[in-house]
A protein has these predicted regions:
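Ligand-binding clefts of soluble mixed alpha/beta catalytic domains
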Residues: 1-529
Length: 529
């Protein structure tokens, strides 16, 4: 026999009615829909929130909100929550706002009330100065609600823009994210995707097939691997949803709650005595200037516990970006990677590094730059695709940054790429060079071919010509291809033993912790987008 319905005209009845409604809101998606979600290896909206937030900290907002649409019979199905779970809680004890799209209700599609819930929690985060994590798993705009859905998308975009650089915004893509829905993650600071589960695209495979005749699958078009390796839309490719959420929590641990506060710190005074581990850096640079080495080694030797949280690891691997700590304080790392394209800068690397430097600057995180760059990658593709304009973004990012900037030149720093990579001339506070540094307009081979073209051309015997060329190369290297010409002019503040790098960075950051620098008043700069 079913239980008698509670009398809602009594206090006990009203309380029982509330409990019933809460239960209904918590399980708004059908059991079958939840089962299908789990069968795909995906979690539900609430399970994701539970994994992200500290246990028992989640406070839900608008759980009883329901859509008001009457088109196409949708009025007969008005589940609580309307397909998105919103609220706030804590991650490692720090306040965070969150919204999680529920694919088990209307396929996670965005309608008016759904959008209003997201807008409300974003406004709440902005007023209270706490990060926003958006968990995306939805089918785009709710067709039944027409232009109203599009209007709410734009309301969300506007808030993404207003919150940019004020509170950290992280997008977690754990399912489909198509059409207009992709632009919100695109504006946020970091986007995390799950391999084989996440898909992002403006137009899907069917539309592309109809319009262009191209055959392309979901994974190839907009999968996690595509956006992590080719487009640069995403910052991390996770193996599963738990890995993705752990990465998000890792990011939050390095970021402040807002632009007016400092990043979380776990102060621990560094031992400034040079250790055997530090001395490993003295043997890092090969004798041959053309032999690569792994810049990760230099980075990890400088950071606490050798811990480096890399961002966009699979995109533009010729430059490394990510977070670490020095004496328990957050730092951002930008570094050329000689293992890829010899560390050359290209369009993708320039834009990747520029965006990262600007993110660090927005959130009060010092930037440490490791330089080993032979120049910009040559080629017609680079020129035609706009390396001049797009490479200039990196200049803009360093020159406008007011956070502490420390640069370490480990080997090559040639031509315009020397200027671009956090040089003293762009406003870096502390510029260090290893004895292996080669700071010059170009490498010895190219310089000799230009400077001594006539001299070499006058030597008819090929063997004698090669011998003379080697002599001239040696002369150029001895004269200019070193850190001391730059040191004489104050372009580098010190030439140091590689093993002393961490000590110099620790002392530099201690001094720069109270740095204050103001740029000329302006509405905003005009970065070459």
């Amino acid at each position: 026999m079913s239980e008698p319905e509670a009398n809602i005209h009594t206090t006990a009845g009203k309380l029982a009615d509330l409990q019933r409604r809460i239960e209904e809101a918590t399980h708004a998606g059908s059991a079958r829909a939840v089962e299908k979600q789990h069968a795909k290896g995906k979690l539900t909206a609430r399970e994701r929130i539970d994994l992200l937030l500290d246990e028992g900290s989640f406070v839900e907002l608008d759980e009883f909100a329901r859509h008001r649409s009457t088109n196409f019979g949708i009025e007969k199905n008005r589940p609580y929550g309307d397909g998105v779970v919103t609220g706030y809680g804590t991650v490692d004890g720090r306040p965070v706002c969150v919204y999680s799209q529920d694919f088990t209700i209307f396929g996670g599609s965005l309608g008016e009330v759904y959008g209003e819930k997201i807008v409300k929690v974003m406004d709440f985060a902005l007023k209270n100065g706490c990060p926003v994590v958006g968990i995306n798993d939805g089918g785009g705009a709710r067709i039944q609600e027409g232009v109203v859905a599009l209007g709410l998308f734009a309301e969300i975009f506007r808030r993404n823009v207003h919150a940019s650089g004020v509170v950290p915004q992280i997008s977690l893509i754990v399912g489909p994210c198509a059409g207009g829905a992709v632009y919100s993650p695109a504006i946020t600071d970091f986007t995390v995707m799950v391999d084989q589960t996440s898909h992002m695209f403006i137009t899907g495979p069917d539309v592309i097939k109809t319009v262009t005749g191209e055959d392309v699958g979901f994974e190839e078009l907009g999968g996690a691997r595509t956006h992590n390796t080719t487009s640069g839309v995403a910052h991390h490719m996770a193996g599963d949803e738990k890995d993705a959420i752990d990465y998000v929590k890792g990011l939050l641990s390095y970021l402040p709650s807002n632009n007016l506060s400092e990043p979380p710190a776990f102060p621990e005074e560094a031992d400034l005595e040079t250790s055997d581990v530090d001395r490993e850096l003295d043997a890092l640079i090969p004798d041959s200037a053309n032999q690569p080495y792994d810049m990760h080694v230099a980075i990890e030797h400088v950071l606490d516990d050798h811990e480096f949280l890399e961002t966009q690891a699979l995109f533009a691997p010729n430059i490394l970006t990510g977070f670490g700590r020095v004496e328990g304080h957050s730092v951002g790392i930008v570094a050329n990677q000689p293992m890829q394209f010899a560390g050359c800068l290209d369009i993708k690397a320039s834009e990747k590094a520029a965006r990262f430097v600007r993110t660090c600057d927005a959130y009060n995180i010092p930037v440490i730059t490791f330089v080993d760059v032979p120049g910009f990658l040559p080629g017609t593709d680079q020129e035609y695709d706009g390396i001049i304009r797009r490479g200039a973004k990196l200049i803009f990012a360093y020159a406008e940054a007011t956070v502490p900037l420390i640069t370490v030149i480990t080997r090559k720093a040639f031509g315009g790429a020397y200027d671009v990579m956090g040089s003293k001339h762009l406003g870096a506070d502390l510029n260090l060079a290893w004895p292996t540094a080669q700071i010059a307009v170009m490498g010895a081979q190219g310089a000799v071919n230009i400077l001594h073209r006539r001299t070499l051309a006058a030597i008819e015997d090929p063997a004698a010509q090669d011998e003379r060329r080697q002599e001239l190369i040696q002369e150029y290297e001895d004269t200019l291809l070193n850190p001391y010409v730059a040191a004489e002019r104050g372009y580098v503040d010190a030439v140091i033993m590689p093993s002393e790098t961490r000590r110099h960075i620790v002392r530099g950051l201690r001094t720069l912790r109270n740095k204050r620098e103001a740029l000329p008043p302006k509405k905003h700069g005009n970065i070459p987008l």
